[in-house]
């Protein structure tokens, strides 16, 4: 009986771990660079490093045989490969996909990209000149931003009025806690 319980909990742990596994092909171990901050000038010139980067899609341009995406870089989770939505951006980078990717499907979405670092590209962010690292993508995963609202629990024993006259005592609106997550 004890062996069955141990087996059950072991299977449960593996099952729960599978829920947070990165998408196939975007595992951290497959890439030599896993953060925008890890990119050095030598990496940009050698064209030999594999990278896994992520962030918010800012702009999409469809070219003749490929699609160009400008991404606002965000740190990526080492476990699930999802970009951290609430952290500050590291910079921007450009991703090239072979073939056509519908630009409307990418608006206001987040992405994790795995591919080859392919040098730099000059561009502008409004009036400022900017040098973008360029990634030729092999694998990618598009994420959708979802929102949850957590309202504080209401303590019924607070005033012993069972909530009937609570509106007299509470003249303000209780703000919910807003949580953002990617799925």
From Swiss-Prot:
Keywords attached to this Swiss-Prot or TrEMBL record, sorted alphabetically, are: Membrane, Transmembrane, Transmembrane helix
Q: Does the keyword Transmembrane helix apply?
A: yes
Q: How is this protein positioned relative to the membrane? A: Single-pass membrane protein
List residues traversing the bilayer. Answer: 7-23
Q: One GO cellular component term, please give it.
A: outer membrane
Q: Where in the cell is it found?
A: Membrane
Q: What is this protein called?
A: Uncharacterized protein HI_0389
């Amino acid at each position: 009986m004890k062996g069955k319980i141990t087996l059950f909990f072991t299977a449960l742990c593996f099952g729960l771990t599978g829920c947070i596994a990165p998408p196939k092909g975007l595992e951290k171990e497959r890439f030599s660079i896993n953060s925008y901050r890890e990119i050095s000038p030598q990496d940009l010139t050698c064209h030999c490093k594999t990278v896994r980067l992520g962030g918010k899609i800012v702009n999409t341009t469809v070219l003749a045989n490929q699609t160009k995406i400008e991404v606002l870089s965000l740190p990526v989770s080492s476990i699930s490969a999802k970009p951290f939505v609430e952290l500050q951006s590291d910079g921007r980078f450009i991703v090239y996909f072979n073939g056509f990717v519908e630009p409307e499907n990418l608006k206001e979405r987040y992405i994790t990209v795995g591919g080859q670092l392919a040098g730099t590209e000059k561009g502008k962010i409004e009036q400022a000149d900017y040098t973008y690292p360029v990634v030729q993508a092999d694998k990618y995963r598009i994420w959708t931003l979802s929102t949850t609202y957590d309202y504080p629990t209401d303590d019924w024993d607070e005033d012993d009025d069972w909530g009937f006259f609570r509106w007299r005592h509470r003249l303000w609106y209780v703000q919910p806690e807003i949580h953002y997550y990617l799925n």
